[in-house]
Amino acid sequence: MTNEVRVRYAPSPTGYPHLGNIRTAMFNWLFARHNGGKFIVRIEDTDRERYVEGAVESILESLNWLGLDWDEGPDKGGDYGPYYQSERLPLYRKAAEKLVAEGKAYYCHCSSEKLDKMREDQIARKEPPGYDRCCRDRGLGQKEGAVIRFKIPLDGQTAFTDLIRGEVTFDNAKQDDFVILKSDGFPTYHLASVVDDHAMQISHVLRAEEWLPSTPKHLMLYKALGYTPPLYAHLPMILGPDRSKLSKRHGATSTIEYKQAGYLPETMVNFLSLLGWAYDDKTELFSREQLIEYFCLEKVSKTAAIFNYEKLDWMNGMYIRTLSAQDLACRAMPFLEKDARIAASGHLNLDYTVKVMPLIQERAKKLNELAELCWFIYSDDISYDPALLIDKKLTKETSLSALKAANARLEALPNFDAASMEEHIRPLAAELELKPGQLFGMLRTASTGQQVAPPLFQTMEVLGRQRCLGRIAMAIARLSEMPSQRS
């Protein structure tokens, strides 16, 4: 094993990558970058029955989206490839047959029916289910349908020092003679990961806590094959708010779903880093560079992390507010294009969107909220009840006069900018013996169709003189057509 830090992210394409899986990738990436080492991606595609088409592409898309660049792996190559296990089958067979030849593994001819019956009987007798080792000492050879099992030592213990959990010990007698090579010639995870971690000179294995019980099997394989094992660190689980294992019932679990929902990659990297690691007890916002500088296994928790959706939304809002108008506009465009009102408006372009984004940047927590916050700044097809133009303490006639006066004042402005508009409209309210909020409310409804909208005069400036005055004229017409009402 090399002295260089070499870690790997080794997903199985049996589904789309969930957050826990990507959190593991990120901790490996941070560990490699912190130590000036290498981050390797290896696709463990040996479970052909559960293989999901498109899963590999989704895995790589997730890594690319989060900026977790790899030094070796798919699309990159490297000195230790290939990086798909399905392309490395001869290596696993050679290792398995070596173990058989040395008496450390054996061919098992038991049928699946026999194994099922064995487990049923064990459960009926209230015994822990497992293989009864009936083929262990029979010296059987290869035949169709046979598997190769590893010979577990029947006594003693297997111990190792986990870099997060400390000393961990397992009784060998409680381990099963596990399969290392299946009847179809594909290896199990146990054999393939050990062979590949050795061949790729992996120095540290950072993986999910669920793999902790498998570690004695892997250490036994390392010893039997004459390999030096890597150092192990088992990362804490991620739980939902109810402290059960994070699942779809808690909300989205696929990384790509978070991308589609409008979370920023910067947010996800920051948020996921805090699921099991902390720099101190108060700092929550970290740049990528800070995470690389601060990350260490000594500060990874042994206890499960709780996924807090409210905190994620808060953090995403914080990151959205740090973006420049240009950057936010570029990121917003794909989401705005999906809104039919905006898409049909004729105003959706990057230059205009750069002007719109600062109006709503403070209110958005996710990119997929942007369209609802600003569609009326794009679309001129705004409809509303004209009664909303009338303040609850005013009459139709008073409101109509106020709107006409405001329209005339706005038409006369040499510069149609927010500062000029406020400079002339605020005094107008006093002249009309209205509160500023009453006049501003009428103009807000007239120019946006909304009662709650972005800052009024800045919005009117972005709309521009022609569109804004056209909307106010339409409001005056609608209000004029309304029957008079009681004061």
Swiss-Prot record:
<keyword id="KW-0648">Protein biosynthesis</keyword>
<feature type="short sequence motif" description="'HIGH' region">
    <location>
        <begin position="11"/>
        <end position="21"/>
    </location>
</feature>
<feature type="binding site">
    <location>
        <position position="135"/>
    </location>
    <ligand>
        <name>Zn(2+)</name>
    </ligand>
</feature>
<keyword id="KW-0547">Nucleotide-binding</keyword>
<dbReference type="InterPro" id="IPR001412">
    <property type="entry name" value="aa-tRNA-synth_I_CS"/>
</dbReference>
<dbReference type="GO" id="GO:0008270">
    <property type="term" value="F:zinc ion binding"/>
</dbReference>
<comment type="similarity">
    <text>Belongs to the class-I aminoacyl-tRNA synthetase family. Glutamate--tRNA ligase type 1 subfamily.</text>
</comment>
<dbReference type="InterPro" id="IPR008925">
    <property type="entry name" value="aa_tRNA-synth_I_cd-bd_sf"/>
</dbReference>
<feature type="binding site">
    <location>
        <position position="108"/>
    </location>
    <ligand>
        <name>Zn(2+)</name>
    </ligand>
</feature>
<keyword id="KW-0479">Metal-binding</keyword>
<dbReference type="InterPro" id="IPR000924">
    <property type="entry name" value="Glu/Gln-tRNA-synth"/>
</dbReference>
<keyword id="KW-0963">Cytoplasm</keyword>
<dbReference type="InterPro" id="IPR014729">
    <property type="entry name" value="Rossmann-like_a/b/a_fold"/>
</dbReference>
<keyword id="KW-0862">Zinc</keyword>
<feature type="binding site">
    <location>
        <position position="110"/>
    </location>
    <ligand>
        <name>Zn(2+)</name>
    </ligand>
</feature>
<dbReference type="InterPro" id="IPR020751">
    <property type="entry name" value="aa-tRNA-synth_I_codon-bd_sub2"/>
</dbReference>
<dbReference type="InterPro" id="IPR045462">
    <property type="entry name" value="aa-tRNA-synth_I_cd-bd"/>
</dbReference>
<keyword id="KW-0030">Aminoacyl-tRNA synthetase</keyword>
<dbReference type="InterPro" id="IPR020058">
    <property type="entry name" value="Glu/Gln-tRNA-synth_Ib_cat-dom"/>
</dbReference>
<comment type="subunit">
    <text>Monomer.</text>
</comment>
<dbReference type="InterPro" id="IPR033910">
    <property type="entry name" value="GluRS_core"/>
</dbReference>
<dbReference type="InterPro" id="IPR049940">
    <property type="entry name" value="GluQ/Sye"/>
</dbReference>
<feature type="short sequence motif" description="'KMSKS' region">
    <location>
        <begin position="245"/>
        <end position="249"/>
    </location>
</feature>
<keyword id="KW-0067">ATP-binding</keyword>
<dbReference type="GO" id="GO:0005524">
    <property type="term" value="F:ATP binding"/>
</dbReference>
<dbReference type="GO" id="GO:0006424">
    <property type="term" value="P:glutamyl-tRNA aminoacylation"/>
</dbReference>
<dbReference type="GO" id="GO:0000049">
    <property type="term" value="F:tRNA binding"/>
</dbReference>
<feature type="binding site">
    <location>
        <position position="137"/>
    </location>
    <ligand>
        <name>Zn(2+)</name>
    </ligand>
</feature>
<dbReference type="Pfam" id="PF19269">
    <property type="entry name" value="Anticodon_2"/>
</dbReference>
<protein>
    <recommendedName>
        <fullName>Glutamate--tRNA ligase</fullName>
        <ecNumber>6.1.1.17</ecNumber>
    </recommendedName>
</protein>
<keyword id="KW-0436">Ligase</keyword>
<dbReference type="Pfam" id="PF00749">
    <property type="entry name" value="tRNA-synt_1c"/>
</dbReference>
<feature type="binding site">
    <location>
        <position position="248"/>
    </location>
    <ligand>
        <name>ATP</name>
    </ligand>
</feature>
<dbReference type="InterPro" id="IPR004527">
    <property type="entry name" value="Glu-tRNA-ligase_bac/mito"/>
</dbReference>
<dbReference type="GO" id="GO:0005829">
    <property type="term" value="C:cytosol"/>
</dbReference>
<comment type="function">
    <text>Catalyzes the attachment of glutamate to tRNA(Glu) in a two-step reaction: glutamate is first activated by ATP to form Glu-AMP and then transferred to the acceptor end of tRNA(Glu).</text>
</comment>
<dbReference type="GO" id="GO:0004818">
    <property type="term" value="F:glutamate-tRNA ligase activity"/>
</dbReference>
